[in-house]
A protein has these predicted regions:
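N-terminal pre-catalytic "stem/leader" segment of glycosyltransferase-like enzymes
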Residues: 1-96
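Conserved donor-binding/catalytic core segment of Leloir-type glycosyltransferases
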Residues: 182-200
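A short, active-site helix/loop in glycosyltransferases that binds the activated sugar's phosphate group
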Residues: 130, 134, 138-175
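Active-site proximal beta-strand in glycosyltransferases
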Residues: 83-90, 101-123
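Nucleotide-sugar donor phosphate/pyrophosphate-binding loop at the beta->alpha transition
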Residues: 119-138, 184
């Protein structure tokens, strides 16, 4: 059974990220993976600074996840052929996972979902575009596949990040539009029986 390390985005109840936290491990297991969830340590359970996530908390959460990943490599607990699935590719340090695998002479697959970033001018992190435009391309280069929720995100990333840096030919095939994953178990069917309506 292949090993999959699930590196979740913070599971906030008011966001779909809580659904992902519950449902992705089960989905990966049913696909035949041995799943290990690498939880982070949040500072907040609500958004105080930022919009989609609390920026202070998300940086802390992801840095504690990265520390655990480094420890797993150090302890030789990452089997060759492992998969790392990141619930948020906007993960400062994701390129370190590629380096850890290379330096430990392990073949791993790094993949995940990119919600938004400085490349989406409507995003709170658009303020980081002067420097994050380079790290975003680095994140994609470190990954084998990056999923995005819409054609808008696919084209925005290509047009605002890859093409200006001359990286489109090499990296665009790593971007894949999937839509935002939803799980049927979160949306129970409501019985809406058909009835004759009498209009008076």
């Amino acid at each position: 059974m292949p090993q999959l390390f699930y590196v979740p985005i913070e599971p906030l109840v008011e966001r779909y990220t809580e659904s992902w936290y519950r449902n992705f491990p089960t989905t990966f297991r049913s696909a035949g993976f041995d799943v290990t969830v690498i939880d982070g340590v949040p500072l907040e359970d609500e958004v105080k600074v930022g919009t989609f996530l609390d920026v202070n908390s998300t940086v802390h959460y992801k840095s504690t996840q990265l520390a655990q990943i480094a420890a797993l490599f150090n302890q030789r607990r990452v089997p060759n052929g492992s998969v790392f699935f990141f619930g948020d590719v906007e993960f400062w340090g994701i390129e370190s996972v590629r380096l850890l695998a290379q330096m430990n002479r392990l073949d791993v697959t790094i993949t995940g979902f990119l919600h938004a970033g400085s490349y989406t001018i409507e995003d709170a992190f658009a303020v980081a575009a002067p420097y994050q435009q380079y790290t975003e391309v680095g994140w994609l280069a470190a990954c084998d596949r990056v999923y995005v929720g819409s054609d808008y995100h696919y084209h925005a990333f290509r047009e605002r990040r890859l093409i200006p840096l001359g990286a489109d030919d090499n990296l665009r095939s790593r971007l894949m539009v999937t839509g935002n994953p939803l799980f049927k178990s979160d949306y129970p069917l409501v019985d809406v029986s058909k009835r004759n309506k009498v209009v008076l």
